[in-house]
């Protein structure tokens, strides 16, 4: 249990922005008829130092990993959920939150506190919503946040080689993407600079020479295959349509699925052509990356014809997908999840086991999507054990 002094300490944080004011890139959507412009709040962060870091001065000066420690702390970056179109990085601030049923304990905040007590620093980040940037804009934001903290590691008192990532729902999806499509991922080894830039976003980065690699990831009830989520629901005994859907997938990727000729589209993002939508649908799924399958199609843009395929050595890519390490991943999912069925995590777990990537999975009986039971003390402790066991330096 945390005493009052410790509670006050671990709940102190400082906020800032990891991208400059006025940031805009080719993925930002005002040119496509966006609902709201990109504001700097899209790139906000909260930073919570490891417990004890503030006892010997500011966090920049102490670099403490915990009480009595002088070592830089490992950092966990938390990516919030919200169907890629809402949510906030402020969700780990308060221990008590209001719900329609009344006040309840925020177990995600207790998770954050437990991490700090065990010598971890925690950062929570925002990213551009799907009505502010088309995919992979949100992934580029997440990777830029990793670069930001790594580049300023000394100022934050963190170890630049020990950065992990976690998140729930949409944040779980992006956590998996960051872990599986890292800068040294096997799929890049075939010599496809377009694919590398697609996932990395270095061209718009303030820190293009800094790695976006994460050492390990813990996605909670994350989406691993956007193509099958709707078929997974009825197979699991749930309704095809979920109240939280509201076109989350097509808003993120450009059109509905399967990708037909543009004249047949039911839903679409203005200004996104068929080739771009095809590319996004092929490259957005962590399950493919967990299996070592990277979509190497190269699109010219502006045409509804069949995309060309870049020449590459299939055998070489398969070998590299097996031999080159991707970040270890621990998956947490509720068995009663009617929004993102737990099979979405099971398939990733099976794929990683097949490739002999360190992995773990916790399936929570009776837990729905976003259920607080996914953050029980026992699961948080198991998460800490996994993080500490797999935290190999990435730079």
Give the predicted meaning of each segment.
Residues 1-395:
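Alpha/beta-hydrolase superfamily serine-hydrolase fold, recognizing
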